[in-house]
Amino acid sequence: MSRPVPNPGILDIAPYTPGKSPVAEPGRKVFKLSANETPFGPSPHAIAAYKGAADHLEDYPEGTSRVLREAIGRAYGLDPDRIICGAGSDEILNLLAHTYLGPGDEAIATTYGFLVYPIATMANGAKLVIAEEKNLTCDVDAILAKVSPSTKLVWLANPNNPTGTYVPFDEVKRLRAGLPEHVILVLDGAYADYVGKNDYESGIELVSTTDNTVVTRTFSKIHGLAALRIGWMFGPANIVDAMNRIRGPFNTSVPAQLAAVAAINDTAHVEMSRAHTETWRNWLSEEFTKLGLTVTPSVCNFVLVHFPTAKGKTAADADAFLTKRGLVLRALNNYGLPHALRMTIGTEEANRLVVEAVADFMAQP
């Protein structure tokens, strides 16, 4: 008996695997540190706006997220007409791929780039080409070497998840200058709000001065609205127009839009989260290093910790040990980093408990 067959290449796509849900020994407090969620939750103003929207759930949203686009425009000094909003930046990435990729096309990503990139690329029949990284960091020359006449998109998470590394803005500009004009450079800035380096820029300036660069952002991380699925992109008017033609007519909900407006306006909440992240990122990196572990320098709200390969001391062993203590980190086998764990920077209590547990783990015979 025949049955429906997916389009070519769909079954070759590895499903996205999110950070695991908390499971621990009975009676033990659990800390989920596997999905890079903020330990502070959203702004109280965002929560109030979300609850206030419940009075009119019978109404459709304004289809273009106008109020949110205007709030983003005010916050960043951008033209709202060049902003498109989506159900998380994931939807934006998929819309980009759906608009500009097809069979015979190629998109480039780096070795340890975000796992949504291959999904978005291959779902549209295109081929994902991998550019090797150098020291777990994007190598601009490696990307440029992979460009072919079939290249249509370059995916660049800056800073990158899961490594936490970033590309200085001068290198991003060099990348843009080296790409053909028909190639769109996608600068995924999901973690941009956490970066405090003087040589870093999210890329908005490039969008303003070129016709082939876009920047995507999310409200899921520092703004704490992951459950609402809300994100945005700033790009050239013609790219935004093309994407709007295939965007779902009511793709972002009223509660999500209003909560995001309140979140972006609460700069004090953002600054508090940023300061906490910087303090504990430095502390965690130092403490793990004291335990003999290698930590990849991070500018994000997480750290990448590398474990030995000796039996009983591996990342998988550490993951099992920590999970039993109610400390849930992210294993990275599906990223090709089986010897590392990614830890979201949590509350002071959670951070200290993880270091204590890792010390106990490393002290085992």
From Swiss-Prot:
Source domain of life: Bacteria
Pathway in which this enzyme or protein is active: Amino-acid biosynthesis; L-histidine biosynthesis; L-histidine from 5-phospho-alpha-D-ribose 1-diphosphate: step 7/9
Modified residues (N6-(pyridoxal phosphate)lysine): K221
InterPro entries per the UniProt record, alphabetical: Aminotransferase_I/II_large, HisP_aminotrans, HistidinolP_aminotransfase, PyrdxlP-dep_Trfase, PyrdxlP-dep_Trfase_major, PyrdxlP-dep_Trfase_small
Cofactor or coenzyme needed: pyridoxal 5'-phosphate
UniProt keyword Iron, yes or no: no
Annotated spans, Disordered: 1-23
Subunit relationships: Homodimer.
PANTHER family per the UniProt record, alphabetical: HISTIDINOL-PHOSPHATE AMINOTRANSFERASE, HISTIDINOL-PHOSPHATE AMINOTRANSFERASE 2
Record's protein name: Histidinol-phosphate aminotransferase
Annotated source species: Rhodopseudomonas palustris (strain BisB18)
Taxonomic classification: Bacteria, Pseudomonadati, Pseudomonadota, Alphaproteobacteria, Hyphomicrobiales
Gene (name only): hisC
